[in-house]
Amino acid sequence: MLRLLFTLVLLALYGPSVDASRDYVHVRLLSYRGDPLVFKHTFSGVRRPFTELGWAACRDWDSMHCTPFWSTDLEQMTDSVRRYSTVSPGKEVTLQLHGNQTVQPSFLSFTCRLQLEPVVENVGLYVAYVVNDGERPQQFFTPQVDVVRFALYLETLSRIVEPLESGRLTVEFDTPDLALAPDLVSSLFVAGHGETDFYMNWTLRRSQTHYLEEMALQVEILKPRGVRHRAIIHHPKLQPGVGLWIDFCVYRYNARLTRGYVRYTLSPKARLPAKAEGWLVSLDRFIVQYLNTLLITMMAAIWARVLITYLVSRRR
């Protein structure tokens, strides 16, 4: 019993910790005006021996198909801190061991640090990983691999240019550091209560306009660099006080490079401009207005006659 209790205490102190970071993505935005970007994570209580630890670039989060660009098994590491240059330019890895490794040789704690130069080539999805047992799999969602996910995205600025009260809603998404490329795909999703959802994927082209029902999508080049996406939505069936969601993304293959998001709520007091109506509706509206005017005139004449009769009777 005491031996079991002692084992449980050792596992609690030095054993692999349950890390909720597998379901969490650490996100950074790329800016050419900033310093190098740093991703890092500390793995605690990693049991030895293990297969390898390292950094990998992932195609997407759904398949977790990742390709390592740096890895080690720590067999050749004698210093507590070492820096490594990777095969990929603009990436540097620092590995730091924690504590006196001779006290508890069966477990290790170390910090993996990845430094990225602020260039668009480094935009993408990354994982710091430890393969605890067996060979490294091609897909990193297996229980034998502990991973921490990171994402470096391009920054997108979202703004509403024309409000819905003008008859159409115009939203612009500016990505200053994005350049046109044949492997980029843009996605736009529009949703709102009482409205049909729109979903469109299209390949980026210079100065193109795409149409889908009552929505127009435009792409233009920004100067000195960057790309602007513009969404124009005509007369959506949206009631006052109800929200409209517009979600914009750009993908390279299945990896998202940037995202813009707008939520617009029509004011409860707003009156949407009416669409063009047929002649029958216009004639019906004219007749109703004419009858209302005639009724008001007749009521005014009756009340005037009653008032005159009352005044004449009082003088007598």
Curated annotation (Swiss-Prot):
Its source organism is Human cytomegalovirus (strain Merlin) (HHV-5)
Record keywords: Membrane included?
A: yes
**What is the designated name of this protein?**
Membrane protein UL148
Q: How does it assemble?
A: Interacts with host SEL1L.
> Which membrane topology term applies here?
Single-pass type I membrane protein
Give the gene that encodes this protein: UL148
Q: Where is the signal peptide?
A: 1-20
| Any single GO CC term annotated in Swiss-Prot or TrEMBL for this entry | membrane
Q: Which domain of life is it from?
A: Viruses
Where, subcellularly, is it found? Host endoplasmic reticulum membrane
Its annotated function is as follows: Chaperone protein that plays an important role in HCMV tropism. Cooperates with UL116 to regulate the abundance of gH-gL complexes in virion. Favors the incorporation of gL into virions once UL116 has regulated the early folding steps of virion assembly. Interacts with the host ERAD machinery and slows gO decay which would otherwise be constitutively degraded. Reorganizes the host endoplasmic reticulum and activates the unfolded protein response. Additionally, plays a role in the evasion of antiviral immune response by down-regulating cell surface expression of host CD58.
Q: Name one GO biological process term.
A: symbiont-mediated suppression of host innate immune response
Q: What is the lineage of its organism?
A: Viruses, Duplodnaviria, Heunggongvirae, Peploviricota, Herviviricetes
Q: Which UniProt keywords apply?
A: Host endoplasmic reticulum, Host membrane, Host-virus interaction, Inhibition of host innate immune response by virus, Membrane, Signal, Transmembrane, Transmembrane helix, Viral immunoevasion
The membrane-spanning stretches of this chain are: 286-308
